[in-house]
UniProtKB/Swiss-Prot annotation:
Protein's organism: Homo sapiens (Human)
Record annotation: effect of changing P248S: Loss of protein expression
Organism lineage string: Eukaryota, Metazoa, Chordata, Craniata, Vertebrata
Transmembrane segments: 35-59, 67-95, 110-128, 148-173, 190-210, 234-255, 272-292
Record protein name field: Sphingosine 1-phosphate receptor 2
Gene name of the encoded protein: S1PR2
InterPro entries membership: EDG5_rcpt, GPCR_Rhodpsn, GPCR_Rhodpsn_7TM, S1P_rcpt
Length: 353
């Protein structure tokens, strides 16, 4: 074990693994690569900004301090950190990669794994919360804070453990034949483990939302039609974006596990597949703010404050620009559902699932 960790600071180890798994090493910065890197950095900056706006909205408005919005804030935080990690990953790629020590390489890839997996686990936590809120016709009892902290803490703890396993020893240093082609210092079995866990999470989210659909459809027959339509619309968007963004990355990692070294040239283009998965962090805040009118209004408020002489509703107002903003009305179905004996109503424009 000591000899394994002694290799972590070896400056030649990363190049050794890349020479073994890659047919050619891209050590020169071409124009196309520079353009692609610039585009990814701009995309990640957009991820950071929009998720930061969601976090500001949740933090500044006490109405959003309920369980559902706190989970959305946790999702926004993980997506924001994913954007930051992917910027660092991009800037430390290319010719810079071969100058990294193994511990630096593990930190680069591990940070991306931790934040992206935290985003996935946050989606699972939201699905669990929605199932508890709807299936049991009860948002939370006296254990509200405990349950929220448990779900949020568990999502980050599992993400840290999952992303930190390679630097703790589950890697292929000293065993080149066991190395991944896409991630040359990661063991293929670790890659398979990650894909399996994410696939199980996807199935769990699907199962929870199917359960929610069944509960909503089987109760309150007089309101089942509008509830079902709105719920199905939200679930279709959430699961559709999740699958579209993550399926390419899952597929390339499964192919990586199955292919012997140098036998699948498509693996050398894996960075494009991971770039697609990053879009999930870009689209998550768009989806959830679009489906919640109050959250959308609060997220856009800082942007409206920068427009001279324009109030919350976009009308020309007197006085100092950006001041004396109108208070938000409580129109969220989630908030109304807390005081009703029935499950929350999923109405267009107000729904959060």
């Amino acid at each position: 074990m000591g000899s394994l960790y002694s290799e972590y600071l070896n400056p030649n180890k990363v190049q050794e693994h890349y020479n073994y798994t890659k047919e050619t090493l891209e050590t020169q910065e071409t124009t196309s690569r520079q353009v692609a890197s610039a585009f990814i950095v701009i995309l990640c900056c957009a991820i950071v900004v929009e998720n930061l706006l969601v976090l500001i909205a949740v933090a500044r408005n006490s109405k959003f301090h309920s369980a559902m919005y706190l989970f959305l804030g946790n999702l926004a935080a993980s997506d924001l950190l994913a954007g930051v990690a992917f910027v660092a990953n991009t800037l430390l790629s290319g010719s810079v990669t071969l100058r990294l020590t193994p511990v630096q390489w593990f930190a680069r890839e591990g940070s991306a794994f931790i934040t992206l997996s935290a985003s996935v686990f946050s989606l699972l936590a939201i699905a669990i919360e929605r199932h508890v809120a709807i299936a049991k016709v009860k948002l939370y009892g006296s254990d509200k804070s405990c349950r929220m902290l448990l779900l949020i803490g568990a999502s980050w703890l599992i993400s840290l453990v999952l992303g930190g396993l390679p630097i703790l020893g589950w890697n292929c240093l000293g065993h080149l034949e066991a190395c991944s082609t896409v991630l040359p210092l990661y063991a293929k079995h670790y890659v398979l483990c990650v894909v399996t866990i994410f696939s199980i999470i996807l199935l769990a989210i699907v199962a929870l939302y199917v359960r929610i659909y069944c509960v909503v459809r089987s109760s309150h027959a007089d309101m089942a039609a509008p509830q079902t339509l709105a719920l199905l619309k939200t679930v279709t968007i959430v699961l559709g974006v999740f699958i579209v963004c993550w399926l390419p990355a899952f597929s390339i990692l499964l192919l990586d596990y199955a292919c012997p070294v140098h036998s699948c040239p498509i693996l050398y283009k894996a960075h494009y597949f991971f770039a697609v998965s990053t879009l999930n962090s870009l689209l998550n805040p768009v989806i959830y703010t679009w489906r919640s009118r109050d959250l959308r209004r609060e997220v856009l408020r800082p942007l409206q404050c920068w427009r001279p002489g324009v109030g919350v509703q976009g009308r020309r107002r007197g006085g100092t620009p950006g001041h004396h903003l109108l208070p938000l009305r409580s129109s969220s179905s989630l908030e109304r559902g807390m005081h009703m004996p029935t499950s929350p109503t999923f109405l267009e424009g107000n729904t959060v699932v």
